[in-house]
Amino acid sequence: MQCLNDFLTEVSGLLWGWPMIILLLGTHLFLTIRLRFPQRHIFKAIRLSVKRDPDATGDVSQFGALATALAATIGTGNIIGVATAIALGGPGAVLWCWLTGVFGIATKYAEGLLAIKCRVKTKNGKMLGGPMYALERGLGWRWLAILFAVFTALAAFGIGNTVQANAIATVAQESYGVSPYITGAIVCLLTGAVVLGGVKSIARVCGMLVPVMAFFYVAGCVYILFVNADYLGAAFRMIVLSAFSPEAAGGGFVGSTVMMAARFGIARGLFSNESGMGSAPIVAAAAQTKNPVRQALVSSSGTFWDTVVICALTGLVIVSSVIAYPDIDFSNGATLTKAAFSKIPYVGTPLLTFGLLTFSFSTILGWCYYGERAVEYFKGRQWVKGYRVIYITAVFVGSVMNLALVWNLADCMNALMAIPNLISLLCLNGIIVHETRKYLWKGRLDKAM
């Protein structure tokens, strides 16, 4: 097992080297400029996300699609992932993670647009879409579309399943002394009860769960920052300065480098918001929407909530707590978050427990849908039920697995998904601009396709 972990560590290091960082950030920046900074429409996007298009075609509402995407996106990457980035890359990783989210809004917009533009309608009226359909229908590259689908089906077991199940089991054991085997069995049953109902069941549960969990977590983080108010200025300075000058972090962070801060900040940023990975467009394609741009805007709002708000708050809580309480061990990402939050009496530990349990479970639900659609693309509908059984079983396995192995596997799969998806976005940018001009720039958002 250690040999496999060492191998995955090497592969992850290669995949997340400078070429990948340049490709991902380059795509974010290119689309930001090409689409005239779609970030400026973020509040319009938020308003659209709570509106319904009842006369539009699709399987779920725009909010249902967004809630499912957010459920899959807001997971341990927002809590443990941020802490791991800080432990490995220093406080500067928070800034890189945040920047990945800000510029990633443009990429998430582009993904959502292509999801609607290239989606297909099955014989039973179900909408299917995502990067695999964009690669096949937009570029004619079915071979690359199949590769993306395979990577997605496998990635679901990493970022969407075992990582999340492991986090739930760890929290349950450390907080309440519950055996990982018992936790794994319970989460298996809960997952099966929801995912067997299909996308509408998943969207319904996520639509109820996401607003509640996000509200309480954000409110709790704001309270902790209020308690740490005297250290916020120092935390901001440390995050910004150490992103470009690691020596500015001082203390135990001095071993980090700019490359490490960028690599782990960007990698965990992608893990957190999934902009450029190609996962969210799979459920965006099922949305009821009048035109591609409306759903593109709704999709982009997910990255704003996930990284610009939640990840930034988590990073500030951790860094300000480390400054306020120098005895915190920040060398281990898995324990850093718990140590930072536990320093806040009454609120810290319950908030972390609530956040990890709800965020992780919702991610398991959302990623099951992604994996199913990927399998359906390259193997056919008849394989979906078997995939569900394996996926639900993997929840139990993930509960008792080695965490380091799980994270390395997830990093590898994330990168392998992102590469073909980013290629499709760059090659099809002309279509993205054309649709944006047609509906957004000319003020025709209410016009149907």
Residue ranges and their predicted role:
Residues M1-T76, I86-A93, G104, F396, ...:
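N-terminal alpha-helical transmembrane segments of multi-pass membrane transport
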Residues I21-G26, S61-A69, W141-A155, A185-I186, ...:
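Select transmembrane alpha-helical segments in multipass membrane proteins
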Residues L23-F30, R34-R47, N166-A172, S179-V240, ...:
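Membrane-interface loop-to-helix entry segments
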Residues F37-S61, T84-I86, G90-V94, W98, ...:
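Flexible loop linkers connecting adjacent transmembrane helices
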Residues A56-L88, L114-M132, E136, V150-A153, ...:
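Alpha-helical membrane segments and immediately flanking helix-loop junctions
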Residues E111-C118, G220-M238, P246, G250-F253, ...:
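Extracellular/periplasmic helix-exit of transmembrane alpha-helices
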